[in-house]
Amino acid sequence: MSAYRKGTKVRWKWGNGTGEGKIVEIFTEDVEKTISGSNIKRKASKDEPAYFIEQNDGAKVLKSKSELEHAD
């Protein structure tokens, strides 16, 4: 699977369902973000980037490439 680009709509497993949003930032080095008061970390590299995603409801998440798939 190739890397995603900014603006790509993606989804991921979340609880018993899925989350969905649009990629707004891409990281190829380890990253730490404070999201809703929590420090979220992801290891990242050129082969396994991390993605900062804005969900459809405006919430933001940080996900690794391996956690994502293209949304329809």
What are these regions, as identified by a protein language model?
Residues 19-26:
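Short beta-strand-centered aromatic/proline hotspots
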Residues 26-32:
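Short, conserved beta-turn/loop elements at beta-strand boundaries and strand-helix junctions
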Residues 33-41:
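Short, surface-exposed loop/helix-turn segments at secondary-structure junctions
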Residues 41-72:
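Intrinsically disordered, low-complexity, charged/polar segments
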